[in-house]
Amino acid sequence: MASSMRSLFSDHGKYVESFRRFLNHSTEHQCMQEFMDKKLPGIIGRIGDTKSEIKILSIGGGAGEIDLQILSKVQAQYPGVCINNEVVEPSAEQIAKYKELVAKTSNLENVKFAWHKETSSEYQSRMLEKKELQKWDFIHMIQMLYYVKDIPATLKFFHSLLGTNAKMLIIVVSGSSGWDKLWKKYGSRFPQDDLCQYITSDDLTQMLDNLGLKYECYDLLSTMDISDCFIDGNENGDLLWDFLTETCNFNATAPPDLRAELGKDLQEPEFSAKKEGKVLFNNTLSFIVIEA
């Protein structure tokens, strides 16, 4: 690996920008919306039974777009019931965006929000110092387990916080996605850091099996349009390359042979589909619902 290649996570601004481009060029949020519309109502059907308040814990809530979709489904299921929504999110920038979104969203009168600027492990340490652990009716971790050092311990801890009839929802990339193939073949040639792990739903379900937890897993197809990656000097393509490889300025710093090999592979059927002249990377998501 060329020494000039460095992890995308070493430049927060660049990471946020490449992530934004990813969202703009993928069906990631539309895929999540489809799950929230079609599957979530059945999943949360009993979480608030006989309760005067529903407690929801969002781990890595980001800018809140998906969190508010979840809240609207809970409100529809339990009209008028108070909801306590606590958010654990390490990025001050994302929390600020989340608060802006809440401020301009109507129908949140019965929802109390609290934000904690910390990582899931910092939250875990803080909670364990308390004598009594707070129980939750619904806990969700959306696309965040890649940034956790000890995933089985994290799963075990948050599962222990589930109350009666409670559920935990985890969203990660599927083992059938292009990410799985990309990481297995090229992961060792990308910059290594201890901030991010290559995990898919296959790894996660194995961990859940080892922990003896009961869960269901649903896969929904999502794609990312990476056509711009194959246009030399395209700024958008450059940022999507950075996101795909988790490398800062990949096109400028990667060895030419790696860039060429990866460019060829990304157009192969196991990574992407070609449709109407576009190259659509397989971004299939897994939605894992864990029982209390």
From Swiss-Prot:
Specify the superkingdom. Eukaryota
Task: Please name the Pfam families in this protein's record.
Answer: Methyltransf_23
Q: Where does S-adenosyl-L-methionine bind?
A: G60, E89, Q94, S120, I142
Effect recorded for L208P: In MRT51; loss of protein solubility; increased aggregation in the cytoplasm
Q: Which disease is it linked to?
A: Intellectual developmental disorder, autosomal recessive 51: A disorder characterized by significantly below average general intellectual functioning associated with impairments in adaptive behavior and manifested during the developmental period.
- This chain belongs to the protein called Histamine N-methyltransferase
Role according to the record:
Inactivates histamine by N-methylation. Plays an important role in degrading histamine and in regulating the airway response to histamine.
Question: What do we know about how this protein assembles, alone or with others?
Answer: Monomer.
- CDD domains, alphabetically? AdoMet_MTases (cd02440)
GO-annotated cellular components: centrosome; cytoplasm; cytosol; extracellular exosome; nucleoplasm
Which residues take part in binding substrate? Answer: E28, N283
One GO-annotated biological process of the protein: histamine catabolic process
Q: PROSITE patterns, alphabetically? A: SAM_HNMT
Q: Which GO terms describe its molecular function?
A: histamine N-methyltransferase activity
